[in-house]
A protein has these predicted regions:
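Divalent cation-coordinating acidic motifs and surrounding scaffolds
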Residues: 1-194
């Protein structure tokens, strides 16, 4: 674990894409590992990048050898909820076009990302992976810094009975006056939403 962006970039540059082409995978094992095998610091930014070219077992994909669910018995939606409750944000990187070849995969990964406040990010070439990772980390850290600064005052006003829309409007105006900007990961949307 590190908070050094150059170290993250250097490590990512050593990775390469290989394998693939087979059906549903043990996605729940990766999610469970992020929850139980990592020693998360209490007040740190907690981001998990789940890179996938196939869906998990048990979501109704054709040819799934474990159609009733993951062989480890874990429920991926429950794991996503547990991540959210622990403050872990899940960014799912969809290796394309492989992932879109499945009927339910992109909807599934979009859903578990959303549960945790993360995003589903399409990735058409592995060469862009380092940019996706660094962009995700910078966006999350930037937003958390802003939340730490304004969150307590906003929470106090809302819990004190102030109108949420009015508080949001005032905060927006203050941030505009300060010329406050946040970093935001942007990417071309290649998935069609139903």
């Amino acid at each position: 674990m590190t908070n050094s962006v150059p170290e993250i970039q250097a490590t990512l540059k050593t990775l390469f894409a290989s394998g693939g082409g087979d059906g549903p995978e043990a996605v729940t094992a990766a999610m469970k590992s992020a929850l139980s095998d990592l020693d998360w610091r209490q007040n740190s930014s907690k981001i998990v990048l789940l890179i996938a070219d196939a869906p998990p077992h048990g979501i109704g994909e054709y040819g799934d050898g474990f159609a009733t669910g993951s062989p480890d018995g874990e429920d991926p939606l429950q794991l996503a909820r547990e991540m959210a409750s622990r403050g872990i944000t899940l960014f799912c990187v969809a290796c394309e076009p492989a992932l879109s070849g499945y009927q339910f995969a992109t909807d599934f990964f979009r859903a578990i990302s959303k549960i945790t406040g993360g995003l589903l990010i399409p990735l058409a070439t592995a060469d862009l992976l380092a940019h996706v990772v660094v962009g995700s980390v910078l966006e999350m850290m930037n937003l958390e810094s802003l939340i730490m600064e304004v969150g307590p005052a906003v929470g106090e006003r809302v819990h004190g009975g102030s109108d949420v829309d009015e508080v949001a409007r005032e905060l927006h105006e203050k941030l505009l006056l300060r010329q406050e900007e946040t970093k935001s990961l942007s990417f071309e949307r290649i998935h069609v939403r139903a």
